[in-house]
Regions:
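Glycine-rich phosphate-binding loop signature in dinucleotide/nucleotide-binding domains
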Residues: 11-16
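Well-ordered alpha-helical segments embedded in enzymatic catalytic cores
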Residues: 3-6, 119
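Conserved core of the sugar-phosphate nucleotidyltransferase
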Residues: 30-97, 107
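Active-site acidic Asp-centered loop
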Residues: 22-24
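Short aromatic/hydrophobic "clamp" motif used to bind/position activated sugar donors
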Residues: 19
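Left-handed beta-helix
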Residues: 98, 105-198
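Feature captures the FAD/FMN-dependent oxidoreductase FAD-binding
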Residues: 27
Length: 198
């Protein structure tokens, strides 16, 4: 929340009606326009993009959600000791810009600084908060293990092709850097070098 508060002047000077908030530790491909269409159709105050975590991820590392039949979030618990569901927040949210400004200002006045706990969880029974289920690959790389596992996932041709050979395309940033160097005696296995730029 503090990072958002530091950008209040930017939010206030913007004219877009909606804001997409996206965590920087997720690996995924998403068309935010589809999430926005869902958000508008539901007349939601907040939309939380969700994922169903696999066996390799512990849901208690994330915000765990319960959702009703209409997609509305009925319960939201941040990093529970025992997760009762595998539906988690991906850290991607859509909200009306003016509402976000009001909630940030109110939270800061009350010395509340956690976006999830002090806004989403606090207002879950007051605001219309909906879940938009992600139906494609998502991985959170906030730990060394998850970072490693995500890199190992990219050895899978289907995952590589999904990210680098299917629309929408992803291009790496072009930098003029020297190539990786492998010395005599190096032992490299299970490797996939990907450099796609345009």
């Amino acid at each position: 929340l503090d990072a958002m508060a530091q950008n209040l002047s930017f939010l206030k000077n913007s004219h877009e009606p909606y804001v997409v908030i996206a965590s920087g530790d997720g690996v995924y491909k998403m068309d935010y326009n589809k999430v926005l269409e869902f958000h508008i159709a539901k007349k939601a105050d907040f939309t939380v993009v969700t994922a169903d975590v696999t066996d390799k991820d512990d849901p208690s590392r994330f915000g765990v959600l319960r959702v009703d039949g209409d997609g509305r979030i009925t319960d939201f618990e941040e990093k529970p000791i025992n997760a009762e569901t595998s539906t988690v927040s991906t850290g991607v949210y859509i909200v009306r810009r003016r509402m976000l400004i009001e909630l940030i200002e109110k939270s800061m006045q009350e010395e509340r600084y956690d976006f999830v706990k002090d806004i989403l969880i606090r207002y879950k029974n007051v605001k219309k908060i909906y879940a938009y289920p992600m139906d494609s690959y998502w991985s959170n790389i906030s730990s060394v293990d998850s970072y490693y596992n995500t890199n190992m996932d990219f050895l899978n041709k289907d995952i590589r092709d999904y990210f680098f050979r299917q629309y929408p395309d992803i291009y790496s940033k072009v930098e003029d850097l020297p190539p990786a160097k492998y010395n005599v005696g190096s032992n490299v296995k299970n490797l996939s070098l990907i450099h796609i730029s345009e």
